[in-house]
């Protein structure tokens, strides 16, 4: 009887599909809340709502910045386009604070 050679079996770990972890703003929202008031917390449902809201605002800013880049026939999305998009998407007072915080964050990261 001739012996049959079987193909080596792959490990079961190789067959498992890997899901990307869902990115969320939960950590940053809870840190901001603790910085404001250390005794407060958020329920899971509230955190999902805030996370959804932040994702929506970020997506709107990204879409607006991309349309600005296309309108100016450029290939690179820079800080200036993002600033313009923030001014267009957010209400004036909130945009002013966002611009100040964004400028501060960029200057701190460039040190």
Curated annotation (Swiss-Prot):
- Read off the InterPro entries from this record: Histone-fold, Histone_H2A/H2B/H3, Histone_H2B, HISTONE_H2B_site
> What's this chain's function?
Core component of nucleosome. Nucleosomes wrap and compact DNA into chromatin, limiting DNA accessibility to the cellular machineries which require DNA as a template. Histones thereby play a central role in transcription regulation, DNA repair, DNA replication and chromosomal stability. DNA accessibility is regulated via a complex set of post-translational modifications of histones, also called histone code, and nucleosome remodeling.
Name of the protein in its database record: Histone H2B
Question: Which molecular function terms from Gene Ontology are attached?
Answer: DNA binding; protein heterodimerization activity; structural constituent of chromatin
Subunit structure as annotated in this protein's UniProt entry: The nucleosome is a histone octamer containing two molecules each of H2A, H2B, H3 and H4 assembled in one H3-H4 heterotetramer and two H2A-H2B heterodimers. The octamer wraps approximately 147 bp of DNA.
- Mind giving the lineage of the organism this protein is from? Eukaryota, Discoba, Euglenozoa, Kinetoplastea, Metakinetoplastina
Ranges of biased composition (kind: Basic residues)? 12-23
Keyword DNA-binding on entry: yes
């Amino acid at each position: 009887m001739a012996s049959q050679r079987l193909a080596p079996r792959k490990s079961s770990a190789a067959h498992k599909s890997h899901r990307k972890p869902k990115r969320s703003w939960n950590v940053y929202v809870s840190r901001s809340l603790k910085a404001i008031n250390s005794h407060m917390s958020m329920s899971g449902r509230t955190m999902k709502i805030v996370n959804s809201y932040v994702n929506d605002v970020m997506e709107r800013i990204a879409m607006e910045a991309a349309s600005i880049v296309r309108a100016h026939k450029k290939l690179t999305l820079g800080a200036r386009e993002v600033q313009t998009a923030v001014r267009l998407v957010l209400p004036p007072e909130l945009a002013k604070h966002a611009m100040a915080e964004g400028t501060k964050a960029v200057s701190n990261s460039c040190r």
